[in-house]
């Protein structure tokens, strides 16, 4: 432990220029670069954009029940298996999610069915 305390004291006594020189010498000795963590952090920043392009799960959101709410309620019941009251509450409480975490094909199919019944639908 005494050796570590001595090293800490010696490092604390270094000037900024000496610390920079020590850093360079250690990089050469150990074959590492102090700039590597910065490059990794910058590369990590691009990950959310890639995730947005590769989205595989979608939420089907009923934006508006439309003028023909009865047909929309019937379609919501058929798609979700909800009871009449729950389906009515969902349609009248729009915007609300009808289905969550479905594939793109299934989401498009549900959207088409609800729009055919007169609803306005969004995929998120």
Curated annotation (Swiss-Prot):
Single GO BP term: translation
GO cellular component terms attached to this protein's record: cytosolic large ribosomal subunit
InterPro entries in the record: Ribosomal_bL12, Ribosomal_bL12_C, Ribosomal_bL12_C/ClpS-like, Ribosomal_bL12_oligo, Ribosomal_bL12_oligo_N_sf
Keyword Ribosomal protein: yes
One Pfam family this sequence matches: Ribosomal_L12_N
Source species, domain of life: Bacteria
One Gene Ontology molecular-function label: mRNA binding
Keyword annotations: Ribonucleoprotein, Ribosomal protein
PANTHER family per the UniProt record, alphabetical: 39S RIBOSOMAL PROTEIN L12, LARGE RIBOSOMAL SUBUNIT PROTEIN BL12M
Family: Belongs to the bacterial ribosomal protein bL12 family.
HAMAP family xref list: Ribosomal_bL12
Subunit structure: Homodimer. Part of the ribosomal stalk of the 50S ribosomal subunit. Forms a multimeric L10(L12)X complex, where L10 forms an elongated spine to which 2 to 4 L12 dimers bind in a sequential fashion. Binds GTP-bound translation factors.
Functional note: Forms part of the ribosomal stalk which helps the ribosome interact with GTP-bound translation factors. Is thus essential for accurate translation.
Name recorded for this polypeptide: Large ribosomal subunit protein bL12
Gene encoding the protein: rplL
């Amino acid at each position: 432990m005494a050796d570590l305390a001595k090293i800490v004291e010696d490092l604390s006594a270094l000037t900024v220029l000496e610390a920079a020189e020590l850093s360079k010498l250690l990089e050469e000795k150990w074959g590492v670069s102090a700039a590597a963590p910065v490059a990794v952090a910058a590369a990590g920043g691009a990950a959310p954009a890639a995730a947005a392009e590769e989205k595989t799960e979608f939420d089907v959101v009923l934006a508006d029940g439309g003028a023909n709410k009865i047909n929309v309620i019937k379609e919501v019941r058929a798609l979700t298996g909800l009871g009449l009251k729950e389906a009515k509450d969902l349609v009248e409480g729009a915007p609300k999610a009808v289905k969550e975490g479905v594939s793109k094909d299934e989401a498009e199919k549900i959207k088409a069915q609800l729009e055919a019944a007169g609803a306005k639908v969004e995929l998120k």
